[in-house]
Amino acid sequence: MQIIHTIEELRQALAPARQQGKKIGFVPTMGYLHKGHLELVRRARVENDVTLVSIFVNPLQFGANEDLGRYPRDLERDAGLLHDAQVDYLFAPTVSDMYPRPMQTVVDVPPLGNQMEGEARPGHFAGVATVVSKLFNIVGPDAAYFGEKDFQQLVIIRRMVDDMAIPVRIVGVETVREDDGLACSSRNVYLTPEQRRAAIIVPQALDEADRLYRSGMDDPDALEAAIRTFIGRQPLAVPEVIAIRDPETLERLPALQGRPILVALFVRVGATRLLDNRVIGHAAPQITQERAA
């Protein structure tokens, strides 16, 4: 595995693969890798000739009072995991490599990015869309892989790629979970043992939402209220966002009527925000399927 730190070096390294018509699979991350990231890597390796992973903690997607400074970082550890996973290239730029001057160009998808998690984290998804579009321009991948745990992010990136005619196939990969159901996340390391035990309320709330919906609760306001009450049984958990949405468009649904729905949760346990989602209903939604941009 070759570790690369600059944009120019990366472009030079990928040039032979492009000339040979090889397909490049790209997994953008912020590092401190876990089983979920490694599943993205596995899919990228299976479906492409060359696999590239980026590790970049992007300051544009963190708010003023968020965890940019303490976000877990361990490049040596991550490089070892990626080497073992047989990744071809690791791109690990610095902030000055990615943003040598203050950014004046912002990529934003306001209707999708200002709701749900974006309502709790203003500007977050503009930062995500900006860095992902820049990485796509740098790497020029044939396919890029994102976890469905960050479902809103996946919808936004798909829409950005469609709107901007970026020639990359966006692949959503099913959420990878710990043995007790908690979604794998780099931020799980923030949790104390007591908080970690409490955090199981998040996937349990999705199970409860699934049960209630399949048993006939099809009023979105009633379902949101029931989920909030369920999470309220755990005193260490504070629900910040509970949203029932269309999984294709993220639009609010006046009535559910048995259609597939997205249940999105954004729950604070201690000082840690935990994100989880599930699509439930009677049919698999299009957004969870691979499709070409």
UniProtKB/Swiss-Prot annotation:
Reaction catalyzed: (R)-pantoate + beta-alanine + ATP = (R)-pantothenate + AMP + diphosphate + H(+)
Principal location: cytoplasm
Record's subcellular location: Cytoplasm
Any one Pfam family match given in the protein's UniProt record, by short name: Pantoate_ligase
Record GO terms (molecular function): ATP binding; pantoate-beta-alanine ligase activity
Binding site for ATP: 30-37, 147-150, 176, 184-187
Binding site residues for beta-alanine: 61
Further details from the record: The reaction proceeds by a bi uni uni bi ping pong mechanism.
Family per record: Belongs to the pantothenate synthetase family.
Protein name: Pantothenate synthetase
Species of origin: Brucella melitensis biotype 1 (strain ATCC 23456 / CCUG 17765 / NCTC 10094 / 16M)
